């Protein structure tokens, strides 16, 4: 609507044109090159295993660490920016071998393939900022890191990062570090969390329905 466009352009996003101009001057790939999935092949910026990054977007960080085996902390925007400028970031946390050890063993004991975002939410809310080593998920992902598994883990990881604060997870027999090091990635005092059908149902039912009409359908989704 005219009113909606007017409010967005003149109030909510009034500085957007300025930001886009600055990004163009910095060398952005193209005018539509805005994405939270900056690791995708089509972006041309896919990190290699072991490569150190200066990123801050939480779902990108957890994907890079877990699925690609790169190394990156959940940086603030300032650390992200300064790391990109000077070419260095502080060496701690998920940049270190010790910081990448799993302090949780998560056992998947569901009777069917768990919905990625629900499973990610369950694990994220349980382990928060810790590193989980996930056992049994490979049964549902086909045993290899193919495109289907990457898509699943993209959604799964985003949920662990947003409903918790997970920056790295290992999936046994699937993710690169888990394939290379196996259970050597697990810390000696790791805790255990079992995810079965009942646990996923508990997490699902814990989400509040804040609409006046519980069965209503949304007009807009973001």
Model segments located where?
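Non-transmembrane, aqueous-exposed alpha-helical and coiled segments at domain scale
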Residues: 1-221
